Swiss-Prot record:
Matching SUPFAM superfamilies: Winged helix' DNA-binding domain
Biased composition (Polar residues): 523-532
Family that this chain belongs to: Belongs to the eIF-3 subunit C family.
Region Disordered, annotated ranges: 1-44, 157-302, 523-543, 886-914
InterPro entries associated with the record: EIF3C (IPR027516), EIF3C_N_dom (IPR008905), PCI_dom (IPR000717), WH-like_DNA-bd_sf (IPR036388), WH_DNA-bd_sf (IPR036390)
Self-association state and partner proteins as the record states: Component of the eukaryotic translation initiation factor 3 (eIF-3) complex, which is composed of 13 subunits: EIF3A, EIF3B, EIF3C, EIF3D, EIF3E, EIF3F, EIF3G, EIF3H, EIF3I, EIF3J, EIF3K, EIF3L and EIF3M. The eIF-3 complex appears to include 3 stable modules: module A is composed of EIF3A, EIF3B, EIF3G and EIF3I; module B is composed of EIF3F, EIF3H, and EIF3M; and module C is composed of EIF3C, EIF3D, EIF3E, EIF3K and EIF3L. EIF3C of module C binds EIF3B of module A and EIF3H of module B, thereby linking the three modules. EIF3J is a labile subunit that binds to the eIF-3 complex via EIF3B.
Organism annotation: Homo sapiens (Human)
Protein name: Eukaryotic translation initiation factor 3 subunit C-like protein
GO biological process, one term: translational initiation
Pfam families (UniProt xref): eIF-3c_N, PCI
Biased amino acid composition, Basic and acidic residues: 199-216, 261-278, 887-900
Length: 914
């Protein structure tokens, strides 16, 4: 080093081990200026030359760490900002990546971020609670990450197939590349074993916990030692504090010189330090392996697992070793477990597991069925409480456990008739182990089954109805019905009347909407035509659904003391009658129950059931050809325009002022599952066709009547919509088919009307959905012919003097007695002014109706009369007001003076002039 910078000493300081030259403080009198003072950090730091790879990768890891922190706090906006910066940083490191390959930690963050965004996207409840910025950022970032990950699709796929290998490779690579890395980085990119166990499962056993603790301690020691080594290599001036103090006296220029080993001794010292560091690292690894081998020899065989693979959990110890398992001990442990139920932070899955283990212990120690039944009750209740949110449905595995547990409980109750369960039994009066007396357990099996039915409904409500998953869940209904039937048999023997009514209602609710195809087939096939084997099979199948519904409902009618259960039973009974085309029984039961008078006071689920029943009643009447009854039954539902909502099959779009989020959640819980839905297009088609068959003849009969009423406003609305269209093409939708058929019927063209109502498109949309589709189509053709005949006679009666009934029969393809009957009814009801000539079989028109010209003259006269009446009324009104005003002013002129006198005089003058 040049001696230009040294003023107070001619020799170099040999006390420094690193070989750094120390110079004394310059004499102050030479320049008269103080040297530049540096902070301690600047004094102690050393300029280190780093490779471009380290710089770029460190920039990427810092951004990844920020993204992971934002993911933890659900800050999607921050994730979006950092992801954009991450993409730019990766672009800068592209040249290095091309040489070295895509780093694993970069692939990991891309895969984790995409999974995280998909999880947020599927969480509908969480999305609703997001603020506007986060929701917008979520949508934007989800699109960007999906587009960005296409370039890394193969890397991400290989990472997801074996994430453990990726973690191991990264760990080894980090150890080789950067020996000064801390455990904090590992926690950011991966999850340590201890952290994983804390997150995923309960604490491990004692030996494994000790083993993991040693590993963590070694990591901490290695971290400290590596930091110390880095400190040693960073300070090349001295090893002692005194030498550091002396080093502070170096000249200003020497502080900014880049330190590098210039002599052979310096190079040898640096190499020796590197060798010492590698040796220490090797010693640490060997020491760790030796300790692992000792643990293997002492505590059995240990298996090294890769990061991310969950350890096999050992069964928790319920009782201390050597404890005598008695009834009191088990009940005490049960109460301890139940005390944590419902508390914040309680692991519900672990609680269920503990209860199941307690059942096994009770069974192994032969503590009796009473204790097992009590624990089973609590297991089922814990399964129901697994989801604290009412809107959340049970997971499939929990649902399966629930069904199995209820079946096991019913097996025990049927196998042990001496066990009595009931919610009126106090815990103090329970008898769980005294076999000399009947066993008494507090609990209600009916409540558990009712809750099971509610959970099944929630599962069906929250499953996509068009997926295979819905079909799989629907198969569970057979198990649900079997459990309800078993509980029904049990309660018929040991339950109260109220409990029997409740379980009967559950059985009815799972039966009323199902069409009994076997019973229907037996009705179509007479007993004489069926073989003996078929008759025996029919007898073995048990009672028909009609007989079952009759028996269950009659019991409720007679025994039930609550109006709600009886009302639901009546509505289900009517629905079942209507579904099986027993129109008169369904109608009579509805009229005798008088439900339509006070149904508005019922709760919403019962009102939905009433609406469903009325709709099914109207469809039943339509199948029987009773179009007027069908129209009246469907009028209230269809005229409101809210059929979907009234039937509990969905919500209509409304403004937020009409429904808040809480109301929307409540209404969604009231929706019926998809397999109970009534086809809304079929419902509307039945209503419009019924309205067409009623409205078109009525319009033809009262064509000249300006004050005629409308039977169906919705049907007239559809007609007006069809008339407003400037260009009419072939009908496509169901409504267009009905409108086109109505126009054809208005002209008396029944064949065209028939072709619009019954064709392949309408068959696929509507008519094939009926159980007896051919019968319905035959009925429709007959009704179209009859109503077209009536419309033809109303429209063209003024044209004919007489018309032969045979001609009408041939024209509308009806037999002569039917034509005779229709015309006779029209004459009797004074709808058609004509008479029948029996010898000639002709209809003689009386021409009492005015002609078209006379109708126009009558309409003109009526309008002129109304115009005159209006003019006279207006004139009288004006005269009365003016006269009263004049008299008041005249009176004021007589009695008052001044201004009022002058005003009255002026008005009197104007009146005289007028």
């Amino acid at each position: 080093m040049s001696r230009f910078f040294t003023t107070g000493s001619d020799s170099e300081s040999e006390s420094s081990l690193s070989g750094e030259e120390l110079v004394t403080k310059p004499v102050g009198g030479n320049y008269g200026k103080q040297p530049l003072l540096l902070s301690e950090d600047e004094e102690d730091t050393k300029r280190v030359v780093r490779s471009a790879k380290d710089k770029r990768f460190e920039e990427l890891t810092n951004l990844i760490r920020t993204i992971r922190n934002a993911m933890k706090i659900r800050d999607v906006t921050k994730c979006l900002e950092e992801f954009e910066l991450l993409g730019k940083a990766y672009g800068k490191a592209k040249s290095i990546v091309d040489k070295e390959g895509v780093p694993r930690f970069y692939i990991r963050i891309l895969a984790d971020l995409e999974d995280y965004l998909n999880e947020l996207w599927e969480d509908k409840e969480g999305k609703k609670k997001m603020n506007k910025n986060n929701a917008k950022a979520l949508s934007t970032l989800r699109q960007k990450i999906r587009k960005y990950n296409r370039d890394f699709e193969s890397h991400i796929t290989s990472y997801k197939q074996n994430p453990e290998q990726s973690a191991d490779e990264d760990a080894e690579k980090n150890e080789e590349d950067s020996e000064g890395s801390s455990d904090e980085d590992e926690d950011e990119d991966g999850v340590s074993a201890a952290t994983f166990l804390k997150k995923k499962s309960e604490a491990p056993s004692g030996e494994s916990r000790k083993f993991l603790k040693k590993m963590d301690d070694e990591d901490e020691d290695s971290e400290d030692s590596e930091d110390d080594e880095d400190w040693d290599t960073g300070s090349t001036s001295s090893d002692s504090d005194s030498e550091e103090e002396e080093g502070k006296q170096t000249a200003l220029a020497s502080r900014f010189l880049k330190k590098a080993p210039t002599t052979d001794e310096d190079k040898k010292a640096a190499e020796k330090k590197r060798e010492d560091k590698a040796k220490k690292k090797h010693d640490r690894k060997s020491k760790r392996l030796d300790e692992e081998e000792e643990e293997d020899n002492e505590g059995g065989e240990w298996e090294r697992v890769r990061g991310g693979v969950p350890l096999v959990k050992e069964k928790p110890k319920m009782f201390a070793k050597g404890t005598e398992i008695t009834h009191a001990v088990v009940i005490k442990k049960l109460n301890e477990i139940l005390q944590a139920r419902g508390k914040k932070g309680t692991d519900r899955a672990a609680q269920i597991e503990l209860l199941q283990l307690l059942v096994q212990i009770a069974a192994e120690n032969n503590l009796g069925e009473g204790v097992i039944v009590k624990i089973k009750f609590n297991i089922i209740a814990s399964l129901y409480d697994y989801n604290p949110n009412l809107a959340t449905y049970m997971k499939p595995e929990m649902w399966g456990k629930c069904l199995d547990c209820i079946n096991e409980l019913m097996d025990i109750l049927f196998a042990n008739p001496n066990i009595f369960v009931g919610e009126n039994i106090l815990e103090e009066s329970e008898n769980l182990h005294n076999a000399d007396q009947p066993l008494r357990v507090r609990g209600c099996i009916l409540t558990l089954v009712e809750r099971m039915d509610e959970e099944f409904t929630k599962i069906m409500q929250n499953t996509d109805p068009h997926s295979q998953e819905y079909v799989e869940h629907l198969k569970d209904e057979a198990q649900v019905c079997a459990i309800i039937e078993r509980v029904q048999r049990y309660l018929e023997e040991k339950g109260t009347t109220e409990e029997v009514c409740r379980i009967y209602l559950l059985r009815i609710l799972h039966t009323y909407y199902k069409f009994d195809y076997k019973a229907h087939q037996r009705q179509l096939t007479p007993p004489e035509g069926s073989s003996k084997s078929e008759q025996d099979q029919a007898e073995n199948e048990g009672e028909d659904s009609a007989v079952l519904m009759e028996r269950l409902c009659k019991y409720i009618y007679a025994k039930d003391r609550t109006d709600r259960i009886r009302t639901c039973a009546i509505l289900c009974h009517i629905y079942h009658h209507a579904l099986h085309s027993r129109w008169y029984q369904a109608r009579d039961l509805m009229l005798m129950s008088h439900l339509q008078d006070n149904i508005q006071h019922a709760d919403p689920p019962v009102q939905i059931l009433y609406n469903r029943t009325m709709v099914q009643l109207g469809i039943c009447a339509f199948r029987q050809g009773l179009t007027k009854d069908a129209h009246n039954a469907l009028l209230d539902i269809q005229s409101s325009g809210r059929a979907k909502e009234l039937l509990g099959q969905g919500l209509l779009l409304r403004s937020l002022q009409e429904r808040n989020q809480e109301q929307e959640k409540v209404e969604r819980r009231r929706q019926v599952p998809f397999h109970l839905h009534i086809n809304l297009e079929l419902l509307e088609c039945v209503y419009l066709v019924s309205a067409m068959l009623l409205e078109i003849p009525y319009m033809a009969a009262h064509e000249s009547d300006a004050r005629r009423r409308m039977i169906s406003k919705q049907f007239h609305h559809q007609l007006r919509v069809g008339e407003r269209q400037p260009l009419l093409g072939p009908p496509e939708s169901m409504r267009e088919h009905v409108v086109a058929a109505s126009k054809a019927m208005k002209m008396g063209d029944w064949k065209t009307c028939h072709s619009f109502i019954i064709n392949e498109k309408m068959n696929g949309k509507v008519w094939d959905l009926f159980p007896e589709a051919d019968k319905v189509r035959t009925m429709l053709v007959r009704k179209i012919q009859e109503e077209s005949l009536r419309t033809y006679l109303f429209t063209y009666s003024s044209v004919y003097d007489s018309i032969s009934m045979e001609t009408l029969s041939d024209m509308f393809e009806l037999d002569l007695p039917t034509v005779h009957s229709i015309i006779s009814k029209m004459i009797i009801n004074e709808e058609l002014m004509a008479s029948l000539d029996q010898p000639t079989q002709t209809v003689v028109m009386h021409r009492t109706e005015p002609t078209a010209q006379q109708n126009l003259a009558l309409q003109l006269a009526e309008k002129l009369g109304s115009l005159v009446e209006n003019n006279e009324r207006v004139f009288d009104h004006k005269q009365g007001t003016y006269g009263g005003y004049f008299r008041d002013q005249k009176d004021g002129y007589r009695k008052n003076e001044g201004y009022m006198r002058r005003g009255g005089y002026r008005q009197q003058q104007s009146q005289t002039a007028y």
